[in-house]
């Protein structure tokens, strides 16, 4: 009460549901929600986990403390991980009323001197290597908005978890951001209905094969 500007962040352990730390941490946070503003979640998972959990935050209690996803990543330093991480960020933007902050971790690692993999940026005495995951984080960091626009993707049956999208707008600039992630082995044709994207339109992105450790600019 004396320091209303202080935000109290609790912890729910190093793993996601259904770990014991996660369950007990959330129980404590909800019971003490008067004092706990948000909780810090951590998880590192396989690309397959991210593909199959694109609804992870949909069922979260909107009245509970918020989520700071303080450490997270897919477990390889490849294009595949960059794609599934982008899918997860699309899902997080959809649930921005629950997940208020995210931070990829770890960030920096010297080649051949690491005790954790993956990291976002690798370096040695002369070179810097940016992983595909770096490019995902960069795109989302500079193409944000303050309003999420509900959208629907229509893709062939059985392929729903291989494609993701997020649409956000910026109320100050009037800009609209349509984010599309395609983890299929073929290109997609995109038709945008219900959103005026005429006028000045710019395309940013990258592409590559699943095992690639470097990216190519989008055509």
Ranges and model annotations:
Residues 1-4, 10-28:
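N-terminal catalytic cores of secreted or lumenal carbohydrate-active enzymes
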Residues 4, 11-16, 41-44, 72-75, ...:
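An acidic- and aromatic-residue-enriched active-site/binding cleft used to recognize and process polar
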Residues 5-9, 28-80, 158:
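Glycoside hydrolase catalytic-domain groove-lining segments
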Residues 20-21, 49-54, 113-115:
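Short, solvent-exposed loop/turn and secondary-structure capping segments
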Residues 25, 53-56, 87-88, 133:
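A general structural detector for well-ordered alpha-helical segments in enzyme core domains, enriched
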Residues 64-167, 171:
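Aromatic/acidic polysaccharide-binding cleft in carbohydrate-active enzymes
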Residues 160-199:
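Carbohydrate-binding surface patches
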Residues 197-219:
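Acidic, Ser/Thr/Pro-rich beta/coil linker or hinge segments at domain junctions
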């Amino acid at each position: 009460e004396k320091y209303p500007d202080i935000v109290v962040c609790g912890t729910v352990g190093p793993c996601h549901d259904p770990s014991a730390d996660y369950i007990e941490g959330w129980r404590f946070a909800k019971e003490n929600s008067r004092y706990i503003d948000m909780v810090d979640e951590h998880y590192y998972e396989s690309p397959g986990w991210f593909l199959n959990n694109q609804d992870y935050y949909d069922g979260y209690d909107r009245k509970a403390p918020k989520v700071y996803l303080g450490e997270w990543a897919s477990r390889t330093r490849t294009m595949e991980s960059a794609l599934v991480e982008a899918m997860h960020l699309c899902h997080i933007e959809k649930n921005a009323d629950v997940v208020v902050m995210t931070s990829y971790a770890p960030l920096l690692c010297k080649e051949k001197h690491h005790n954790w993999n993956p990291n976002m940026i690798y370096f040695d005495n002369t070179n810097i290597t940016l992983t595909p995951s770096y490019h995902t984080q960069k795109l989302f960091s500079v193409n944000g908005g303050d309003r999420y626009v509900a959208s629907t993707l229509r893709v062939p049956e059985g392929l729903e978890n291989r494609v993701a999208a997020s649409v956000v707008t910026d109320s100050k600039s009037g800009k609209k951001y349509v984010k599309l992630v395609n983890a299929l082995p073929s290109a997609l044709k995109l038709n945008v209905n219900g959103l005026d994207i005429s006028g000045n339109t710019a395309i940013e992105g990258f592409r590559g094969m699943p095992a690639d450790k470097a990216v190519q600019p989008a055509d």
